[in-house]
Curated annotation (Swiss-Prot):
GO function term, MF aspect, one: 5-methyltetrahydropteroyltriglutamate-homocysteine S-methyltransferase activity
EC numbers: 2.1.1.14
Binding sites annotated in the UniProt record for 5-methyltetrahydropteroyltri-L-glutamate: 17-20, 132, 539-540, 585, 629
Protein name: 5-methyltetrahydropteroyltriglutamate--homocysteine methyltransferase
Natural source organism: Caulobacter vibrioides (strain ATCC 19089 / CIP 103742 / CB 15) (Caulobacter crescentus)
Needed cofactors: Zn(2+)
Binding site for Zn(2+): 665, 667, 689, 750
InterPro entries in alphabetical order: Cbl-indep_Met_Synth_N (IPR013215), Cobalamin-indep_Met_synthase (IPR006276), Met_Synth_C/arc (IPR002629), UROD/MetE-like_sf (IPR038071)
Keywords per UniProt: Amino-acid biosynthesis, Metal-binding, Methionine biosynthesis, Methyltransferase, Repeat, Transferase, Zinc
Keyword tRNA processing: no
Biological role: Catalyzes the transfer of a methyl group from 5-methyltetrahydrofolate to homocysteine resulting in methionine formation.
């Protein structure tokens, strides 16, 4: 027997973002369902055959999704809220995409095309609530469940895709999101109701799926229960035992590989190793010390999947060092009971480093994307099966790359270290308490009650993207590109004045991404051409690679702010991305504590804040959209993270006078458990994403007696749906029941970059009218 390799999941989007473009063409009505599904089928085929060719013995299937795997699971088990008008049977694409993106409810004659995702003639309904997948930058759609929820098998996707791969000659290991994690991720509108109470109703459907896979020929099935990386109660652990007892009994011919990731099992390890499954995956990147405990606690027959290659970051592994750890494990456990794998699904990494033809060669040799990570696993397996000499050249190349990175002068900047050492506590505090700052800001800004604004970005149209691409390729000059951007900015400013917004933004047309734009102007970052990863649905991002010490060589946003402010007498916000978000939305160096890297970024942003104020900016927004997602999965680790995250924000924000108003923005967030940290950030105004939660997220601010101002999002920008004025006035009324009117701002949930202008204009006009009505009431 030999050591084999597995992947837990592979990127879905395609090396050239084929899925993104197929989805957007379908939604726009330019293509039909057959074209979309053909693209999806082609991507799956290439992914399966490529992994098999690289030597993966356990190739995953059912890890592909048209939008989100949690949504796929909800559809598979028939968890379709009544609002979507589903009457049983197969869930069609219109219903599927309505759950993902919302449903404007246009009459059939006005439907935007066969791929719009709207159910013509139905009442408009919002999308399911979207939130972050554990502590990653991927978003999932939260299932919406209710007491008495009925489940039924309504999709054959897992079996269909297993058979699809089988027809190509690839025997796969299907992947299912586990029933306990599925229920823990679900939302409910029923007070005091726990979705986990539905486990007994859900398990028979999972049993049907497993039996169907067994009948199709599957011998292993991977079941993901990442909830095992969380703090679980004794009851939840008991429910896991009950669930897996039932699943093992339901399909005795199928071997189950239980996977958890993004952290160790901790106090859940005893439960995990004793579940009636044949295999258990360990995330040995996040929890390297858990290997010995798992070996000692588990039965000899349990197959251990060792997640030794980082599935969430882009750094090349030191293979000889990994072999030093793995060789004793194989000798002790036996090669037939060891599988090598990434720490988690490779969904979170770019696909192929070979596509990066323009990347700095020195930095490139330090990196590994999904394909290269699989190749690294193959080298490890060959070394374990055939000896190190059989892959000597690959091992030496790996060791040489590790040495080169560790000794490169591009990693460390003594000036950055000196500046960081000179930071004092006073640099992380505003000059006066909030009450005093509020009066100074009121006098300076003279805004009406319930002031209206947007979060920052406006739609990046085809014309904007084409101009950016032409500029990047050298097809247009600097002057031509800047003139185009000025024209777009001027149009956006004029439109905002016309519709009556109180505080304006310049639209960010010059920015490709809210993190990449800043990273490109900061020392210590590198960027890719094709390093795309999925954020949600068709939304893809190219995270910067933070490889060295960070500093700001020159001002980054001042010129664009000065130009935009010169077009209007209304306040123009300076728009910055905060240090914690830049950190959390980047691939971060692993040779330095994250908090140290974050403080370096904070000093760079502080310089920009001070320069904006000196240029005349009265309002400066420092977005910390990703503050919460950086939270460790274990509560016991939260305080340490929040301490340095809040300190980093304050270090960036505290260099200004009392009359300068500091805004921040957070999205995808639940605030109850971090409200004290949000208060400690000491921002003058915070805008948050609340529309999908119907303002319930504000309850945290009420209980905390949050003193500063808040802009609760009054409509969901992740959906193309345009909310009615009455819908937004209802949300504002709900907000005013929770907070004093003088605390409230009126704004969308998030930036508008991914929306189209017609829906944006209609929604903002309605929002401004809703604010006017609310002021008059």
């Amino acid at each position: 027997m030999t050591v084999t390799i597995a992947t837990l999941g592979f990127p879905r989007i395609g090396p050239k973002r084929e899925l993104k473009f197929a989805l957007e063409a379908y939604w726009a009505g330019k293509t039909d369902a057959d074209a979309l599904l053909d693209t999806a089928r082609d991507l799956r085929a290439k992914t399966w055959t490529r992994q098999a060719a690289l030597g993966v013995a356990h190739v995953p299937s059912n890890d592909f999704s048209l939008y989100d795997h949690v949504l796929d699971t909800a559809v598979m088990v028939g968890a379709i809220p009544a609002a979507y008008g589903w009457s049983g049977g197969t869930v069609d694409l219109a219903t599927y995409f309505a759950m993902a993106r919302g449903d404007q409810g246009r009459p059939a004659a006005e439907a935007c095309g066969p791929g719009c995702g709207h159910a013509p003639g139905a009442d408009g309904v919002p999308a399911l609530e979207m939130t972050k997948w554990f502590d990653t930058n991927y978003h999932y759609l939260a299932p919406e469940l209710s007491p008495g929820q009925a489940f039924a098998l309504t999709s054959s996707k897992p079996v269909d895709e297993f058979l699809e791969a089988k027809a190509l000659g690839v025997h796969t290991r299907p992947v299912l999101l586990g029933p306990v994690t599925f229920l823990k991720l679900a939302k409910t509108k029923a007070e005091g109701f726990s979705p986990l109470s539905l486990l007994s109703a859900l398990l028979p459907v999972y049993g049907q799926v497993l039996r169907g896979l067994a009948a199709a020929g599957a011998d292993w099935v991977q079941i993901d229960e990442p909830c095992l990386a969380l703090d679980l109660t004794d009851f939840e652990r008991a429910e896991l035992r009950r669930a897996y007892g039932a699943l093992t009994h339901a399909a005795p011919g199928v071997r189950l590989m239980l996977t958890s990731y993004f952290g160790g099992y901790g106090e859940n390890l005893a439960t995990a190793v004793n579940l009636p499954v044949e295999g258990l995956h360990l995330d040995l990147v996040r929890a390297p010390d858990e290997l010995e405990a798992a070996l000692a606690a588990s039965r000899e027959s349990l197959v251990l999947s060792l997640g030794v290659i980082d599935g969430r970051n882009v750094w090349r592994a030191d293979l000889p060092a990994l072999l030093d750890r793995l060789e004793p494990v194989v000798a002790r456990r036996g090669s037939d009971r060891v599988v090598l794998a990434p720490s988690c699904s490779l969904l979170h990494t770019p696909i192929d480093l070979d596509l990066e033809t323009a990347l700095d060669p020195e930095i490139r040799q330090w990196l590994a994307f999904a394909v290269q990570k699989v190749e690294a696993l193959a080298v490890l397996a060959q070394a374990l099966n055939g000896g190190r000499a059989s892959v000597a050249a690959a091992l030496e190349a790996s060791a040489q790359a590790a040495r080169a990175r560790a000794t490169s002068p591009r990693i460390h900047d003594p000036k950055v270290a000196e500046r960081l050492a000179a930071v004092t506590p006073d640099m992380t505090r505003r000059r006066s308490p909030y009450d005093q700052r509020r009066e100074a800001q009121r006098a300076r800004l003279n805004l009406p009650p319930l002031p209206t604004t947007t979060i920052g970005s406006f739609p990046q149209t085809t014309e904007v993207r084409q101009a950016r691409a032409a500029f990047a390729k050298g097809q247009i000059s600097d002057a031509t590109y800047e003139a185009f951007l000025r024209q777009e900015t001027a149009r956006a400013v004029a439109w905002q004045e016309t519709v009556g917004l109180d505080v304006l933004v310049h639209g960010e047309f010059e920015r490709n991404d809210m993190v990449q734009y800043f990273g490109e102007q900061l020392a210590g970052f590198a960027f890719t051409q094709s390093g795309w990863v999925q954020s949600y649905g068709s939304r893809c991002v190219r995270p910067p690679i933070l490889f060295g010490d960070v500093s700001r060589p020159a001002p980054m946003t001042v010129d664009w702010w000065r130009y935009a402010q010169g077009l209007t007498r209304r306040p123009m916000k300076g728009m910055l991305t905060g240090p914690v978000t830049i950190l959390n939305w980047s691939f971060v160096r692993d040779d330095l504590p994250r908090e140290t890297a974050c403080r370096q970024i904070a000093l760079a942003i502080r310089d920009e804040v001070v320069d904006l104020e000196a240029t005349g900016a009265a309002i400066i927004q420092i977005d910390e959209a990703a503050l919460r997602e950086g939270l460790p999965l274990r509560r016991g680790d939260w305080d340490a993270y929040l301490d340095w995250a809040v300190e980093s924000f304050r270090l960036a924000a505290s260099g200004v006078a009392d009359a300068t108003q500091i805004h921040t923005h957070m999205c995808y967030s639940e605030f109850n458990d971090i409200i004290a940290a949000i208060g400690a950030m000491d921002a003058d105004v915070i805008s948050i994403e609340t529309a999908r939660s119907k303002m319930e997220l504000l309850d945290a601010f009420v209980g905390y007696a949050y003193p500063a101002q808040i802009g609760p999002g009054v409509y969901d920008i992740h959906s193309p749906r345009v909310p009615a004025v009455e819908e937004m006035t209802t949300l504002l009324a709900a907000a005013r029941q929770r907070l004093a009117g003088e605390q409230l701002w009126v704004n969308p949930d998030c930036g508008l970059k991914t929306r189209k202008w017609p829906e944006t204009q209609a929604a903002i006009v309605n929002m401004v009218e809703a604010a006017r009505r609310a002021r008059a009431s």
